[in-house]
Amino acid sequence: MRKAAITRNTNETSIKVAVDLDGSGKYAVSTGVGFLDHMLEQLSRHSLMDLEVDAKGDLHIDAHHTTEDVGIAIGQAVNQALGDRKGICRYGSAYVPMDEALTRVALDLSNRPYLIWKVAFGRDKLGTMDTELFKEWFQAFAQAAGATLHVESLYGDNDHHIVESCFKALARALREAVEIDPRKADAVPSTKGTLGGSL
């Protein structure tokens, strides 16, 4: 089973994360940031990755450190669960609509972290969460997971719908990319023979 657990403690946050890439989309998420919890639940449900997150952070300041560090911890857990990445499909992509909003995500689990983020919001906050923090979460996740990640909002008016379609599209792309290719189950999906992160 491809599982991993991560504990991350800093002066700003204390976070425990567990993932099972071969799960069924079960989740138990508590970050202290209601909207972030909602998005992480969508990530789990639509990727079929079981996800546990218990985070305590300096929310008396703002949600920045908690959001970023949760992204790091989930990314680290996914990276660890992937191991040498042998047999994975590696690539995934998805178009996900939510009412008037449509998002496109393309993902490569290449161990070459990079984020392209083409998402704009009309509001400063969703609930208590600053909308600028969503990019911080995706950046932290991509870096820690070793993922090349392109996220593009094609159109949409409702900011809730836009960001939710971003997380759901990531979920669907991740589900596709982590799948084991039965034709290449014993091979690393790279002509270099490794996805160890070196250029």
Curated annotation (Swiss-Prot):
Keywords: Amino-acid biosynthesis, Cytoplasm, Histidine biosynthesis, Lyase. PANTHER family: IMIDAZOLEGLYCEROL-PHOSPHATE DEHYDRATASE, IMIDAZOLEGLYCEROL-PHOSPHATE DEHYDRATASE HIS7. Pfam families: IGPD. It is an enzyme of class 4 (lyase). Pathway: Amino-acid biosynthesis; L-histidine biosynthesis; L-histidine from 5-phospho-alpha-D-ribose 1-diphosphate: step 6/9. NCBIfam families: PRK00951.1-1, PRK00951.1-5, PRK00951.2-1, PRK00951.2-4. One of its GO terms (molecular function) is imidazoleglycerol-phosphate dehydratase activity. One of its GO terms (cellular component) is cytoplasm. It catalyses: D-erythro-1-(imidazol-4-yl)glycerol 3-phosphate = 3-(imidazol-4-yl)-2-oxopropyl phosphate + H2O. One of its GO terms (biological process) is L-histidine biosynthetic process. Its main location: cytoplasm. Its EC number is 4.2.1.19. It is found in: Cytoplasm. Belongs to the imidazoleglycerol-phosphate dehydratase family. The keyword Transport does not apply. The keyword Manganese does not apply. This is Imidazoleglycerol-phosphate dehydratase. InterPro entries: IGPD_sf, ImidazoleglycerolP_deHydtase, ImidazoleglycerP_deHydtase_CS, Ribosomal_Su5_D2-typ_SF. It comes from Paramagnetospirillum magneticum (strain ATCC 700264 / AMB-1). It comes from the Bacteria.
